UniProtKB/Swiss-Prot annotation:
It catalyses: tRNA(Leu) + L-leucine + ATP = L-leucyl-tRNA(Leu) + AMP + diphosphate. Keywords: Aminoacyl-tRNA synthetase, ATP-binding, Cytoplasm, Ligase, Nucleotide-binding, Protein biosynthesis. HAMAP family: Leu_tRNA_synth_B. One of its GO terms (biological process) is leucyl-tRNA aminoacylation. One of its GO terms (cellular component) is cytosol. Its EC number is 6.1.1.4. Signal peptide: none annotated. This is Leucine--tRNA ligase.
Amino acid sequence: MQEQYRPEEIESKVQLHWDEKRTFEVTEDESKEKYYCLSMLPYPSGRLHMGHVRNYTIGDVIARYQRMLGKNVLQPIGWDAFGLPAEGAAVKNNTAPAPWTYDNIAYMKNQLKMLGFGYDWSRELATCTPEYYRWEQKFFTELYKKGLVYKKTSAVNWCPNDQTVLANEQVIDGCCWRCDTKVERKEIPQWFIKITAYADELLNDLDKLDHWPDTVKTMQRNWIGRSEGVEITFNVNDYDNTLTVYTTRPDTFMGCTYLAVAAGHPLAQKAAENNPELAAFIDECRNTKVAEAEMATMEKKGVDTGFKAVHPLTGEEIPVWAANFVLMEYGTGAVMAVPGHDQRDYEFASKYGLNIKPVILAADGSEPDLSQQALTEKGVLFNSGEFNGLDHEAAFNAIADKLTAMGVGERKVNYRLRDWGVSRQRYWGAPIPMVTLEDGTVMPTPDDQLPVILPEDVVMDGITSPIKADPEWAKTTVNGMPALRETDTFDTFMESSWYYARYTCPQYKEGMLDSKAANYWLPVDIYIGGIEHAIMHLLYFRFFHKLMRDAGMVNSDEPAKQLLCQGMVLADAFYYVGENGERNWVSPVDAIVERDEKGRIVKAKDAAGHELVYTGMSKMSKSKNNGIDPQVMVERYGADTVRLFMMFASPADMTLEWQESGVEGANRFLKRVWKLVYEHTAKGDVAALNVDALTEDQKALRRDVHKTIAKVTDDIGRRQTFNTAIAAIMELMNKLAKAPTDGEQDRALMQEALLAVVRMLNPFTPHICFTLWQELKGEGDIDNAPWPVADEKAMVEDSTLVVVQVNGKVRAKITVPVDATEEQVRERAGQEHLVAKYLDGVTVRKVIYVPGKLLNLVVG
């Protein structure tokens, strides 16, 4: 074996071996316990970033560990290949999205291989291929036939620049997240999947997910937003229809002093016919985008419609206002306002001088002071006629019952969750498999015309989708009648909602899933990805699993047993102010820094001499130019070093601060491991270990080895605290480096220890461990080696540390056999130089002995 650790030589050799031997390819094997380890599939943006590397390293560590436990481990990878960035890049680079995407996939695949991830490449899939999306199209047509898909006109956030619909989350401060253009509201027909039909199950089954982070489950609970309340109908004077509102607080109903409707509500539209102020307000609202986060903070505005509704219980007339905080697509498009007990209603009423009527007493039983704000806490009713004196629950039920009896109220369960709009007006996505016949009939694309293939050889103008721009593309014939294909494409969350299941049978040609394979591998045992996917992807992922279950394809209720959300990767960020006052961000790689004695950055400049402002650690991003290229790091230090640093620098679910000094530290550690194995193997063959012939020191070292195995096993397997596992291995390495290597049993013990260390490090740093395992003459390839098992007998402490005091002052610490008597301990203590010195010529008056812990000799 060569003396120096040269990762660039060994890593490519080991990777070639894995490729040729197809080491990580697996098939169903009923005789073995399966383990399905999955990291969220990447978008092929062109290059891997450190966030990817962290995600996939965690996955690979878990997969390799489970494999060493003897399980049949599936770890696949693929590409979430549709999406808007490809269109932008294609326009910029004067190409089409398909070649750009496939080039990126090829490049990033090499990067993944360079990092040594143990993927089953035979299962690789790209979601932009017809072989993949054809099954999604087929499934969609089946959902349509089941009544779970429908088309309706809905108001969307429209970016006039990108010519596309934006999700609420993609609108930042009223502007498009990509191009910063002001967003408009537009009504267009769209396809929806009825996720609301599964709302209760999606909510209740969160309780089954014991190994998902509570934060994610809470976010999903809030997103689904189940509430119990009452739907109340109001008559409106001089208006043909009634108004219906939903409230979760019927106990406050006697304090309702006005109603508010959305600008798009038919009542507001009718009132605007002869009210120019209202018409202008409706126009303004139409172009204001409303994401919920902004709804809470934006200025509340409204205009009186002039209509009066009649309070069903008091008979009072109350005004109906059009307001910008009511959304047509949420609930009924109308709300009842109780300004005394709802802060938003209070602010609106105060602004426009509307009546504020308190109906709930303060906690101390007094009338509430509403001069500054609403009283939003629940309490006892007053000012409420027959309901006075009732507490919240009693009032809720009494008022709900009365409204129901009168025929103007109905108890309802409501959800915040909306149906999933899956239409996108983009080109680079899977075509939606629906057609419109000449006579206006809308129907699913017939099976014999699936897949509806997206043409890849197109010219992008950056504005109109090529399949919308080409009238010929949409033309088809169905049942002998001319028909037009849908030119919208699927939301790309569709592809990522079921890919995990297709990995179990990627070549299956008879349908979406081969149930036998799917039910062998599913559910996923651990799913690893960022918490930013908590509500969108992870909710659709769960929803799709239930849809596939109800179609008879899978037999489990949930797609993944455990979810691990890795933390973000942070790096130093620097900028200098340019001539026009703009910030120019400088890569941390190019910053020349001065640090104080605590290692903190106090001064920085770049090669051109600009004084740099240091803004601290922040998430690696293009905008701050503080991303570190993983490829550069792998070329400099080797993949094993990068992987080890990633797993050691911080717990997997916490943020990780990228520090090159830490990477260098990881590299030094691997060099030490290499050196120790080199020095050990250079001495030739090793005798068998005879555990009965070991000295006390050898037994103590062997105890450390096996205690480390036990700790690392628990840290990786149960606790998933990978950083503490690595720390324990490092600690053991320090002891091994100091251990004697002259005697036959010293070397036999070192052999046992190194074989254990190399196997424990293998999930983290597989290339160096593959090589060292061969040098240590381990059996077969380390990829098929079993995880080391701690020897219980070796861990039994046969000696213990006793503190020796003279007159209460510590004079020595001695190691004695566990079963030593007090006499033997006193005798052993007397042999210590310092103890003997303080006992010389004095009488021991009293002995205090705590067995196995303390010996205190009181002398006088």
